[in-house]
A protein has these predicted regions:
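Primary mode marks residue(s) on the alpha4-beta5-alpha5 output face of response regulator receiver
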Residues: 30-234
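N-terminal secretory signal peptides that target proteins for export/translocation
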Residues: 1-9
Length: 234
């Protein structure tokens, strides 16, 4: 039964290409896209800082998030709201960390709570912060991609550390207009791996992979059965 549910989830995930925090191939911006350009910055910010902290923490079980560092988005980028004790970092990603060809790339409603372990905080998170800094500085999608790719090539942004992963278990997130909070899942970040080595995407496998060649990144996704508050995914 779980296998059937996971399989259905996987098909849906691939169809909507929902994955925030992973960039893909650059494509020309569709004039008919629902969000053709960046909205005013205020629409991406959360007025209540405590609400953003709570949303970020909802990405992982309380046993993890209560001692995690928490970042919130300000007008000039992410800021540390709470110092952590356990190496985890919780953050609410915005729409510009979605796939470059995602029609919701500029969706001001996008809120993706994610809680990264220490290895991911030292590697993957740096890319999210850099992308955000570039966007808030007025860069276009294409300019952001060019700058990130150059920083990776120059090793200004590090490769993924072994064991880099994150929790995305929040029922309060908003990943897309179509799917809202989608389903609870874990993600594992690897520098350009072969998905077949994980058995990703094979019939009956609960593991799925997204390859991002320009960013030299492979993200493995594993759906799970419960949200961070312990309630089942239905």
């Amino acid at each position: 039964m779980l296998g059937e549910k996971v399989g259905a989830i996987a098909v849906k995930s691939i169809a909507v290409a929902f994955m925030l925090g992973t960039a893909w191939h650059v494509m020309a911006q569709d004039a008919k896209a629902p969000y053709p350009s960046m909205a005013p910055l205020d629409q991406y910010l959360m007025e209540d800082r405590s609400s953003e902290i709570a949303l970020a923490r909802s990405a992982a079980p309380e046993s993890i998030s209560r001692d995690a560092e928490v970042l919130v988005l300000g007008r000039h980028g992410y800021e540390t709201a709470i110092q952590g004790k356990n190496g985890f970092v919780c953050i609410v990603e915005r729409s510009w960390t979605a796939p470059i060809d995602d029609p919701g790339f500029w969706n001001p409603k996008g809120r993706a709570p994610i809680c990264l372990n220490a290895a991911a905080a030292r590697s993957y998170l740096l890319r999210t912060i850099k992308k955000t800094d570039l966007i808030l500085a007025g860069r276009t999608k294409a300019q952001m991609v060019e700058a990130i790719a150059a920083a990776i090539d120059k090793k200004e942004l590090p490769a993924m550390e072994p064991g880099a992963m994150c929790y995305m278990l929040s029922k309060q997130g908003y990943l897309s207009d179509r799917d809202g909070h989608w389903h609870p899942h874990l993600m594992f970040f690897v520098s350009q791996a072969d998905p077949a080595a994980w058995g990703a995407g094979l019939p009956g496998s609960p593991v799925f992979a997204f390859n991002d060649t320009w960013e030299h990144l492979t993200t493995f996704l594993v759906p799970v059965r419960v949200w961070s508050d312990g309630t089942p995914d239905r």
